[in-house]
Amino acid sequence: LRWDAWLFRGAWRFGTTRFLVLSAVCAVAGAMLHLALHSNDMVPLVGASAAISGQMAAATRFALLAGMPLGGMAAGHNEIYRRPAATLGVLIRDSRVMTFLLVWFGVNAVVGIVGSGTLSSGSIAWEAHVGGFLAGLLLFPLLDPVGTEAPADRV
């Protein structure tokens, strides 16, 4: 399995339009959470990390489960990406998904508490990451065409 296959198959699964909508909504959700927690800050929020975090969260709904591309099956068959996504109930019972979620949130908590550890003077808007991630995790079923219709505008 090539690294770019798992990274970009979410766009293939959604189609271009849905993928861009998910990305934009996750970016806005991340910015809104950051704004809610830092309403008096005068520092602008710049970056795509909330959108990327949302894409990662959306991928957990199908890519980390058993038989899925990152869940131990290295076959390159496209039908893997046509299987219905897991519900939140299934996700919380899957040890691979829970390990990923704990590591992801743990890294963001450490970055939020300790900082990035770099010499740059800027900070990382970890709150935006969390907002984008939660949006992607929760909104995935609303945008996922699998089981209903195949997207006509595949990437």
What positions do the PLM features span?
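A detector for small-residue-rich transmembrane helices and their helix-helix packing motifs
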Residues: 1-155
